[in-house]
From Swiss-Prot:
Residues linked to a glycan: S113
Processing after translation: Monoubiquitination of Lys-121 by BRE1 gives a specific tag for epigenetic transcriptional activation and is also prerequisite for histone H3 'Lys-4' and 'Lys-79' methylation.
Gene Ontology CC entries for this record: nucleosome; nucleus
Molecular function per GO: DNA binding; protein heterodimerization activity; structural constituent of chromatin
Gene source species: Xenopus laevis (African clawed frog)
Residues bearing the modification Phosphoserine: S15
Primary subcellular site in the record, as a coarse category: nucleus
Quaternary structure note: The nucleosome is a histone octamer containing two molecules each of H2A, H2B, H3 and H4 assembled in one H3-H4 heterotetramer and two H2A-H2B heterodimers. The octamer wraps approximately 147 bp of DNA.
Chain positions of cross-link Glycyl lysine isopeptide (Lys-Gly) (interchain with G-Cter in ubiquitin): K121
Keyword Nucleus listed: yes
UniProt subcellular location: Nucleus; Chromosome
Biological role stated in the UniProt entry: Core component of nucleosome. Nucleosomes wrap and compact DNA into chromatin, limiting DNA accessibility to the cellular machineries which require DNA as a template. Histones thereby play a central role in transcription regulation, DNA repair, DNA replication and chromosomal stability. DNA accessibility is regulated via a complex set of post-translational modifications of histones, also called histone code, and nucleosome remodeling.
Protein name as annotated: Histone H2B 1.1
Compositional bias of kind Low complexity: 1-12
Amino acid sequence: MPEPAKSAPAPKKGSKKAVTKTQKKDGKKRRKSRKESYAIYVYKVLKQVHPDTGISSKAMSIMNSFVNDVFERIAGEASRLAHYNKRSTITSREIQTAVRLLLPGELAKHAVSEGTKAVTKYTSAK
């Protein structure tokens, strides 16, 4: 006799959707598909900047769309740059150039410096 399906614990605020098993008519279990999102990362940054501020699900959805859009723009531009230079690999140099081309003035400078800092931290941790 099959055991009854146990529901997964409630996800933390801003985390991915919990995977729960649902019963079909024929008794087989089917997993819900996971929805990938930047929500947990947006939430972590929000708490670093404004610890006492929350975010609505609609605002989180907008932030998720924004991050996806910026990611696609940078990836597309970096891909174009690699293609122009007859390269098959997108390196940090292509990403940096794409950021300089896409973001305006001071924002590009800050993004490049933060990116360089992140790459340095990553390589030193290896």
